[in-house]
Regions:
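Juxtamembrane transmembrane-helix termini in multi-pass membrane transport proteins
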Residues: 11-63
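Structural signature of hydrophobic alpha-helical transmembrane segments
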Residues: 11-28, 77-86, 158-172, 224
Length: 224
């Protein structure tokens, strides 16, 4: 039993340690606030729950059947990184060019939205690529591909990966659920600066993901 418990904890921390820095829900909070201006606290709570559930499904799918999905469509991981990197760059660039006048206009429009309309943006862009983007998916697929198929504690491996994914989903929910409180604490001016910086970092992350995939593809065609 001690061996099983230790193996369970190790697998849980493997998933959390690999994914949390990339998912970075706390760092994404300012961008989440920017994209949901005008929504009520209840609306953000609904969105936070939906994004956390969407993220959980994406992570678990990537871990357990991600390699099989890519193989079925004949897609390599570097190609996913190139395509995903372009999407992340586009999202970050759009946020970076978002003016304060646009924010005010969006806020007026979003105040008129019914809560049922929140689901339209819950998956794209709030879950994918903002929260669980191509970088997170690539890491999750890699973690799943490297799992030990013949492990003595097979159930602890599966349970640990599920628990680790649940921890990531919970961190997403809590960060986004209390995003408005964080925004009030920092103030509008500070949040605006943080949003711009976060958007620029998002563009840089997209470029890095794109380059990781592109450099891998180039090595297969260029002479050494």
């Amino acid at each position: 039993m001690p061996g099983m418990l230790r193996n369970l904890i190790e697998n849980t921390f493997l998933v959390v340690g690999a994914l949390f820095p990339i998912v970075n829900p706390i760092g994404n909070t300012p961008i989440f606030l920017s994209l949901t201006k005008g929504l009520s606290g209840h609306g953000r709570a609904v969105l936070a729950r939906m994004i956390a559930l969407n993220g959980l499904v994406l992570i678990l799918t990537s871990i357990f059947i991600g390699t099989h999905i890519l193989a079925f469509f004949g897609i390599s991981l570097p190609v996913v990184q190139v395509g995903g990197g372009l999407v992340v760059i586009s999202t970050g660039w759009g946020l970076l060019r978002h003016s304060d006048d646009d924010d005010a206009s969006d806020e007026d429009k979003q105040k008129e939205c019914h809560e049922a309309d929140y689901s339209k943006q819950a998956f794209y862009p709030l879950t994918l690529p903002l929260t669980v983007g191509p970088g997170s998916i690539s890491v999750a697929i890699t973690v799943g591909a490297n799992r030990q198929e013949g492990s003595e504690w097979r159930w602890t491996l599966i349970a640990g990966m599920i628990l680790g994914s649940l921890v990531i989903a919970a961190s997403i929910y809590l960060s986004y659920r209390f995003a408005e409180r964080i925004g009030r604490t920092l103030g509008d001016s500070a949040m605006n600066v943080i949003i711009r910086i976060s958007s620029f970092i998002l563009v840089c992350i997209g470029v890095q993901i794109l380059w990781n995939g592109l450099s891998t593809l180039l090595r297969t065609v260029l002479p050494r």
